[in-house]
């Protein structure tokens, strides 16, 4: 609470965001009756002729982030949240007093106190963005403006080389649209990756070889061993006609033919109709070894091989 004085002077109410004359002796705002007020520096109270300065900020004295929300929320979908994310506590945007060209030699602390009402005025109206303004005494070449940052953000050309002073932005090394934004961004990337591997398996089997596959009946030995179709997992019935591959694995005709029309390989051991092991050197994946998966696949259904070898 400020000390009582004969002349209270001008104060700034942080609740109303206006300059006021406090109500004595409690030093509260006469508008909202709040005690959250701050005494303004002497040089901002009045001019030499005694006239009170206007509280309406000019275009030059207006904080540079006065309308930052309007700029950010007019960006394309997804960019607004992205732009707010880069403005953290370590990001500073310089502000310049009108007509200032050189350092006036005053203490930096006094300059911060002089500009304190403007910063609080902006902070009371824009509580969402955590922004820090830095006072400078002259405009320097190469310092980015807010309008320039927003424009480059829309154009997608911001890189660490164009704005080297933006530390948090350094994690982006390409167009922001190349990154996954939002809930559907990761799903789109996974779908794209899966589509790239869709046609990397064995090519379709030759139709003549598919038609030439022998059809054999299911025997009592097959039924007794609990033999089932590796595709649909249904048990074979006695006397049922099934297709036999060169690797001696048995399948239902409706299960194996559609598979062979897309992949020239056995679903169990990965051998093609010509006897080649497609799991060891699959087309499109040269240099990748699948020997362990091949051996495990071959040993996964010993009953199928034993049963067919005895047929």
From Swiss-Prot:
<feature type="compositionally biased region" description="Basic and acidic residues">
    <location>
        <begin position="103"/>
        <end position="116"/>
    </location>
</feature>
<dbReference type="GO" id="GO:0008270">
    <property type="term" value="F:zinc ion binding"/>
</dbReference>
<keyword id="KW-0597">Phosphoprotein</keyword>
<dbReference type="GO" id="GO:0005829">
    <property type="term" value="C:cytosol"/>
</dbReference>
<feature type="compositionally biased region" description="Polar residues">
    <location>
        <begin position="47"/>
        <end position="61"/>
    </location>
</feature>
<dbReference type="GO" id="GO:0061630">
    <property type="term" value="F:ubiquitin protein ligase activity"/>
</dbReference>
<dbReference type="GO" id="GO:0005654">
    <property type="term" value="C:nucleoplasm"/>
</dbReference>
<dbReference type="GO" id="GO:0070936">
    <property type="term" value="P:protein K48-linked ubiquitination"/>
</dbReference>
<dbReference type="InterPro" id="IPR013083">
    <property type="entry name" value="Znf_RING/FYVE/PHD"/>
</dbReference>
<feature type="compositionally biased region" description="Basic residues">
    <location>
        <begin position="117"/>
        <end position="132"/>
    </location>
</feature>
<protein>
    <recommendedName>
        <fullName>E3 ubiquitin-protein ligase RNF126</fullName>
        <ecNumber>2.3.2.27</ecNumber>
    </recommendedName>
</protein>
<keyword id="KW-0007">Acetylation</keyword>
<dbReference type="GO" id="GO:0006513">
    <property type="term" value="P:protein monoubiquitination"/>
</dbReference>
<feature type="zinc finger region" description="C4-type">
    <location>
        <begin position="13"/>
        <end position="32"/>
    </location>
</feature>
<feature type="binding site">
    <location>
        <position position="29"/>
    </location>
    <ligand>
        <name>Zn(2+)</name>
    </ligand>
</feature>
<dbReference type="GO" id="GO:0042127">
    <property type="term" value="P:regulation of cell population proliferation"/>
</dbReference>
<dbReference type="GO" id="GO:0042147">
    <property type="term" value="P:retrograde transport, endosome to Golgi"/>
</dbReference>
<feature type="compositionally biased region" description="Low complexity">
    <location>
        <begin position="289"/>
        <end position="311"/>
    </location>
</feature>
<keyword id="KW-0963">Cytoplasm</keyword>
<keyword id="KW-0862">Zinc</keyword>
<dbReference type="GO" id="GO:0016567">
    <property type="term" value="P:protein ubiquitination"/>
</dbReference>
<dbReference type="Pfam" id="PF14369">
    <property type="entry name" value="Zn_ribbon_19"/>
</dbReference>
<dbReference type="InterPro" id="IPR001841">
    <property type="entry name" value="Znf_RING"/>
</dbReference>
<dbReference type="GO" id="GO:0005737">
    <property type="term" value="C:cytoplasm"/>
</dbReference>
<dbReference type="GO" id="GO:0043162">
    <property type="term" value="P:ubiquitin-dependent protein catabolic process via the multivesicular body sorting pathway"/>
</dbReference>
<dbReference type="GO" id="GO:0044314">
    <property type="term" value="P:protein K27-linked ubiquitination"/>
</dbReference>
<comment type="pathway">
    <text>Protein modification; protein ubiquitination.</text>
</comment>
<dbReference type="GO" id="GO:0005154">
    <property type="term" value="F:epidermal growth factor receptor binding"/>
</dbReference>
<feature type="binding site">
    <location>
        <position position="13"/>
    </location>
    <ligand>
        <name>Zn(2+)</name>
    </ligand>
</feature>
<dbReference type="GO" id="GO:0043161">
    <property type="term" value="P:proteasome-mediated ubiquitin-dependent protein catabolic process"/>
</dbReference>
<feature type="binding site">
    <location>
        <position position="32"/>
    </location>
    <ligand>
        <name>Zn(2+)</name>
    </ligand>
</feature>
<dbReference type="InterPro" id="IPR039525">
    <property type="entry name" value="RNF126-like_zinc-ribbon"/>
</dbReference>
<keyword id="KW-0863">Zinc-finger</keyword>
<comment type="subunit">
    <text>Interacts with CCDC50, EGFR, FLT3 and SCAMP3. Interacts with BAG6 (via ubiquitin-like domain); required for BAG6-dependent ubiquitination of proteins mislocalized to the cytosol. Interacts with CDKN1A. Interacts with AICDA.</text>
</comment>
<dbReference type="GO" id="GO:0005634">
    <property type="term" value="C:nucleus"/>
</dbReference>
<feature type="region of interest" description="Required for interaction with BAG6">
    <location>
        <begin position="5"/>
        <end position="100"/>
    </location>
</feature>
<feature type="modified residue" description="Phosphoserine">
    <location>
        <position position="5"/>
    </location>
</feature>
<keyword id="KW-0808">Transferase</keyword>
<feature type="region of interest" description="Sufficient for interaction with AICDA">
    <location>
        <begin position="200"/>
        <end position="304"/>
    </location>
</feature>
<keyword id="KW-0833">Ubl conjugation pathway</keyword>
<dbReference type="GO" id="GO:1905168">
    <property type="term" value="P:positive regulation of double-strand break repair via homologous recombination"/>
</dbReference>
<dbReference type="GO" id="GO:0042059">
    <property type="term" value="P:negative regulation of epidermal growth factor receptor signaling pathway"/>
</dbReference>
């Amino acid at each position: 609470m400020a000390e009582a004085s004969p002349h209270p002077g001008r104060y700034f109410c942080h609740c109303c965001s206006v300059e006021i004359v406090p109500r004595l002796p409690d030093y509260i705002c006469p508008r909202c009756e709040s005690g959250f007020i701050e005494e303004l520096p002497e040089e901002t109270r009045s001019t030499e002729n005694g006239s009170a300065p206007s509280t309406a900020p000019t275009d030059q004295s207006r904080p540079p982030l006065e309308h930052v929300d309007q700029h950010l929320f007019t960006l394309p979908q997804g960019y607004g949240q992205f732009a707010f994310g880069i403005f953290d506590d370590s990001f500073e945007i310089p502000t310049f007093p009108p007509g200032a060209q050189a350092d006036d030699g005053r203490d930096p602390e006094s300059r911060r106190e002089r500009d304190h009402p403007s910063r609080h005025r902006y902070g009371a109206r824009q509580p969402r963005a955590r922004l820090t303004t830095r006072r400078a005494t002259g405009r320097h070449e190469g310092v980015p403006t807010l309008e320039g940052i927003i424009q480059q953000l829309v154009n997608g050309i911001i890189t660490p080389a164009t704005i080297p002073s933006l530390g948090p932005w350094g994690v982006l090394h390409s167009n922001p649209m190349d990154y996954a934004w939002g809930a559907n961004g990761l799903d789109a990337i996974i779908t794209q990756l899966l589509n790239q591997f869709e046609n990397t398996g064995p090519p379709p089997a030759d139709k003549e070889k598919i038609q030439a596959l022998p059809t054999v009946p299911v025997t009592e030995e097959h039924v007794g061993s609990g033999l089932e179709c590796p595709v649909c997992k249904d048990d074979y019935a006695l006397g049922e006609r099934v297709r036999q591959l060169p690797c001696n694995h048995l399948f239902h005709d409706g299960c194996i033919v559609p598979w062979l029309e897309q992949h020239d390989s056995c679903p169990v051991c990965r051998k093609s109709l010509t006897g080649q092991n497609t799991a060891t050197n699959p087309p499109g994946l040269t240099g990748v070894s699948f020997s362990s998966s091949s051996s495990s696949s071959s040993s996964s259904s010993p009953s199928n091989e034993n049963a067919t070898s005895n047929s």
